[in-house]
Amino acid sequence: MKYVIGIDLGTSAVKTILVNQNGKVCAETSKRYPLIQEKAGYSEQNPEDWVQQTIEALAELVSISNVQAKDIDGISYSGQMHGLVLLDQDRQVLRNAILWNDTRTTPQCIRMTEKFGDHLLDITKNRVLEGFTLPKMLWVKEHEPELFKKTAVFLLPKDYVRFRMTGVIHTEYSDAAGTLLLHITRKEWSNDICNQIGISADICPPLVESHDCVGSLLPHVAAKTGLLEKTKVYAGGADNACGAIGAGILSSGKTLCSIGTSGVILSYEEEKERDFKGKVHFFNHGKKDSFYTMGVTLAAGYSLDWFKRTFAPNESFEQLLQGVEAIPIGANGLLYTPYLVGERTPHADSSIRGSLIGMDGAHNRKHFLRAIMEGITFSLHESIELFREAGKSVHTVVSIGGGAKNDTWLQMQADIFNTRVIKLENEQGPAMGAAMLAAFGSGWFESLEECAEQFIREAAAFYPKAQNVQKYKTLFDLYKNIYTHTKDLNTALKSFRKN
């Protein structure tokens, strides 16, 4: 039996999985690393922590699996998007990495929007947001100019770890798409953008496909991990692209619903010219010459977490949600908007805050929970609605994360999205997508689709119920009015909020 390893470099920890040719996860490990937050809005990490914890996780994985190193054909990576790693000409790190959730770059974003207008949208198919890589680069250029002058190349987080394990520098299209420097449809760095902002295109790393073999392990890395030097290393992909691969989102009509702290609706896209006018993200997929569109709900699972911490800190989520299935659709006239930390899709608005509309004395805790679950799902449905309005088919939704752990919620998704919703048997997220890229790159399969047939198994399917679909359609129309009617109120309340 042969094996591959998938590595997922997350924001708080690195996860590794060992997968055999049947798609079975034979071992997994995880190692945490700290977040560095020196000021409000700052979010950084030391890239060295990623490297050391990844090597430790791999060493433990090999040790506990009892698999011989010669039977491990390849390794690939998934990683948190947008993070900025700057290297000098000696390939040494110049400063801590600035992460995707760092918000210091608002002034740079405003100036970029004023400078480029919709021209940036024509090239990158995305609007400027603080999370993207280019605004971080501009911040360093403005605030740490002497340091920035030493920059020979920039990398994304997973690409830096791969560089340290192989000695070669690359990035691939799915991660490059999140920099605001890539011409998405031409699949090349944009000299136009680089020239206009005064950054040399020479600092952009070489581009490869996600399944390309980029090298093998350095001797000291092989020695520390227990792997062989000849173990092939494949480029990998951005976490969302790998999450899509790991859930089988590889053909038109298939969409991913992922509910973690935030919520993501991600849909496969073949047509590179489809225009969403920046209302949703549009990125290169980990599957060659394919794309995906993505909408984000900032406080999806976070809404339930907030409710639990505030009103039921000693209960598990399973206990918390008991009895929700008995509450009728609409929670006895209660609607919730999940804007606890602002919103991303379809309203890019950092000032908006959440609402519970329709409260009365007859509502109890279960009504609030039902309303929160429905409100999160309505918010996610706004992204699906944008996809459908642009002519996309959404005939199957694969649900992963917190939203897939409760059958009532899965049925709710089927009814609100008005489509079939699939629960997976063995959900591994982006790490599985990375392993699949290694399996495909190693020649186990002719295509990622063939790999998905072998690796991904459905546990259950939920279908929309006509009477529920109609009720939710009425409620969804009411839900969409809440943003408009509370926007000015929340802006006026902003000065009263604790910073």
Curated annotation (Swiss-Prot):
GO biological process, one term: D-xylose metabolic process
InterPro entries: ATPase_NBD (IPR043129), Carb_kinase_FGGY (IPR000577), Carb_kinase_FGGY_CS (IPR018483), FGGY_C (IPR018485), FGGY_Carb_Kinase (IPR050406), FGGY_N (IPR018484), Xylulokinase (IPR006000)
UniProt superkingdom: Bacteria
Binding-site residues, substrate: 81-82
EC numbers: 2.7.1.17
Claim: Kinase is one of the keywords in the record: yes
UniProt keyword annotations, A-Z: ATP-binding, Carbohydrate metabolism, Kinase, Nucleotide-binding, Transferase, Xylose metabolism
Active site: 239
GO molecular function, one term: ATP binding
Record site: Important for activity: 8
Reactions it catalyzes: D-xylulose + ATP = D-xylulose 5-phosphate + ADP + H(+)
Function field: Catalyzes the phosphorylation of D-xylulose to D-xylulose 5-phosphate.
Alphabetical list of HAMAP family matching this protein: XylB
Similarity section: Belongs to the FGGY kinase family.
NCBIfam families found in the cross-reference section: XylB
Name used for this protein in its record: Xylulose kinase
Protein encoded by which gene: xylB
